[in-house]
Amino acid sequence: MKKIKIGIFGPKGRMGESILEQIKNFSELKLSSLCENKKHSIVGKELAGILVHSDLKKLVNESDVIIDFTIPEATINLLEELRKSKKKTAVVTGTTGFTKSQEKKFLKLCKGLKILQSFNMSLGINILKELVKKTAKIISEESDIEISEIHHNMKRDVPSGTALTLADSVNEGVKVKKKNSYRLQSTNLLRKKNEIVFSSVRGGDV
């Protein structure tokens, strides 16, 4: 059986390192390419028996599927490279923290490409999304909704993609859509009726 060649974009990130370990457990997968930020000290060195590089074109050409857990700018650069390539490499991306303009550009670049995007791919979170949707349908008209989330101290985006996904699940279940509200500093303002308020904590290795 032909093995699926897997390229990892961001192999030295928390998720990248975890994926490297998991690939060993699947005989049908073959680690084929590792691409990291050109300024990272790992570039030019071996990781899991493969020389780490910073060439997006090389990553695309050496992979059947690219797994991407980087930052928005890097993900957009990857998609731009894919659009130039004749090789129809698929991408699984869990990158979060897109601004509205970046998200618009991301969606435009995705057209015609094989892209799977999720802000959180765990089974538990996807079950939770369905529970939140159903709960919101029952109680949200009478309730104030807040989302409190905590992540490790290396997490860049606030609120997290998972928190935003749960807010989307709330809005899938309600009749009157709620607006996301970010309280980044202390204010004397009262919360509004139809809003979802986020609070975020970053610390340790959660």
Task: State the predicted function of each range.
Residues 2, 9-57, 140-206:
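C-terminal substrate-binding/catalytic lobe of Rossmann-fold NAD(P)-dependent oxidoreductases
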Residues 2-4, 89:
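Nucleotide donor/acceptor-binding cores
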Residues 14-19, 74-77, 101-102, 125-128:
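Short glycine/serine/threonine-rich phosphate/pyrophosphate-binding segments
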Residues 63:
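An anion/phosphate-binding loop that grips the pyrophosphate of nucleotide cofactors and donors
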Residues 66-67:
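N-terminal Rossmann-like NAD(P) cofactor-binding module of classical short-chain dehydrogenase/reductase
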Residues 72, 78-101:
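ADP-ribose/adenylate-binding Rossmann-like module
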Residues 87-90, 105-122, 140-145:
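Rossmann-fold dehydrogenase core element
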Residues 94-116, 126-134:
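Rossmann-fold NAD(P)-binding glycine/threonine-rich loop
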